[in-house]
Amino acid sequence: MGIKGLTKLLADNAPKAMKEQKFESYFGRRIAVDASMSIYQFLIVVGRTGMETLTNEAGEVTSHLQGMFNRTIRLLEAGIKPVYVFDGKPPDLKKQELAKRYSKREDATKELTEAVEEGDKDAIEKFSKRTVKVTKQHNEECKRLLRLMGVPVVEAPCEAEAECAALCINDMVYAVASEDMDSLTFGAPRFLRHLMDPSSKKIPVMEFEVAKVLEELELTMDQFIDLCILSGCDYCDSIKGIGGQTALKLIRQHGSIESILENINKDRYQIPEDWPYQEARRLFKEPNVTLDIPELKWNAPDEEGLVQFLVKENGFNQDRVTKAIEKIKFAKNKSSQGRLESFFKPVVSTSVPLKRKDTSEKPTKAVANKKTKGAGGKKK
């Protein structure tokens, strides 16, 4: 789920913290990618028609491999250096959210069965997507594919979004790419949406800067974390009746969840029983991450390994895979130039921030202070 309604909240209240960027703007940049979110998108979109998906001869789904292969090649061709980060064990506080997701998939499965019996194509399309789940096998197959492509893989001890943010905070990558906004709450200095969009539409990349988010919202990082918890996150329920705009107003007025709880109208707003907001806050401020990872390297592709895995084991077209390998090799040579050309021909965003209402209040700048395990990182 991520942070409920955060994109719209920022568009309405912190437009200067958001800017559209071209794909090519990130030439030579290391980008940490939330792998599970990308795989989920590929399973939903790539090669899907109703209940039909891409499969190999054994009937195993290959949409995630097709999507990961093609999208990663596009990143490499643009000179981007992706680092895919995979989820580890979820925190205990997330079990309730995972149980909700399981229940929703069960309901969708029942609805899908009825839609199939009725021959309702639109309903089949809708409910089949809601039954999608990223499995351990999907993750392991994508890790194998990426390593064969010469692309670095990081296995997070816990949440991938937190690990991505830690890599960015410690200058091991330039930005974090995902569709869920959690990485901003974990303090990632730069966050990118739509970089991994698998649709055929050319959607511009949306870049967020956490420092500008805080400045525009006139909040400290601690207050921003409380805002995200109030808006709705994966770690606990939110207060019924309080959405993003109300949460922002309350945080600006009272400064913290504790102060809000002391002053809120409890007849109007129902506080969740045994609400673990303090533990949720701790998970955002002190996530379980590691920087003790192998040096990030983008190696030459294992051509024989890719043919074996994609063509022989998963039924991919031999000619297409061979041509794709050539693209990877060419892209690697191109990216070895680094960002030297930026000294002569910088890529500048042509977007104009959305307008917002004038405010007479003086914004307060704040800097995220995150705790991570391990030592410092490499230059991004």
UniProtKB/Swiss-Prot annotation:
Cofactor dependency: Mg(2+)
Biased composition (Basic and acidic residues): 355-364
Pfam family, one: XPG_N
Region (Interaction with PCNA): 336-344
Note describing how the cofactor binds: Binds 2 magnesium ions per subunit. They probably participate in the reaction catalyzed by the enzyme. May bind an additional third magnesium ion after substrate binding.
GO terms, biological process: base-excision repair; DNA replication, removal of RNA primer
Basic residues composition bias: residue spans: 368-380
Binding site for Mg(2+) 2: 180, 182, 234
Isomerase found in the keyword field: no
UniProt-annotated location(s): Nucleus, Nucleolus; Nucleus, Nucleoplasm; Mitochondrion
EC numbers, comma separated: 3.1.-.-
Chain sites annotated for binding DNA: 71, 159, 232, 234
Keywords, sorted A to Z: DNA damage, DNA repair, DNA replication, Endonuclease, Exonuclease, Hydrolase, Magnesium, Metal-binding, Mitochondrion, Nuclease, Nucleus, Phosphoprotein
UniProt cross-references to PROSITE patterns, sorted A to Z: XPG_1, XPG_2
Positions of the UniProt region annotated as N-domain: 1-105
Processing and modification events after translation: Phosphorylated. Phosphorylation upon DNA damage induces relocalization to the nuclear plasma.
Enzyme class per UniProt: hydrolase
Annotated region described as Disordered, given as residue ranges: 351-380
Binding of Mg(2+) 1, residues: 34, 87, 159, 161
One Gene Ontology term of the molecular function aspect: DNA binding
Family of this protein: Belongs to the XPG/RAD2 endonuclease family. FEN1 subfamily.
Function, as annotated: Structure-specific nuclease with 5'-flap endonuclease and 5'-3' exonuclease activities involved in DNA replication and repair. During DNA replication, cleaves the 5'-overhanging flap structure that is generated by displacement synthesis when DNA polymerase encounters the 5'-end of a downstream Okazaki fragment. It enters the flap from the 5'-end and then tracks to cleave the flap base, leaving a nick for ligation. Also involved in the long patch base excision repair (LP-BER) pathway, by cleaving within the apurinic/apyrimidinic (AP) site-terminated flap.
HAMAP family: Fen
The protein's assembly and partners: Interacts with PCNA. Three molecules of FEN1 bind to one PCNA trimer with each molecule binding to one PCNA monomer. PCNA stimulates the nuclease activity without altering cleavage specificity.
Name of the protein this chain belongs to: Flap endonuclease 1-A
UniProt source species: Oryza sativa subsp. indica
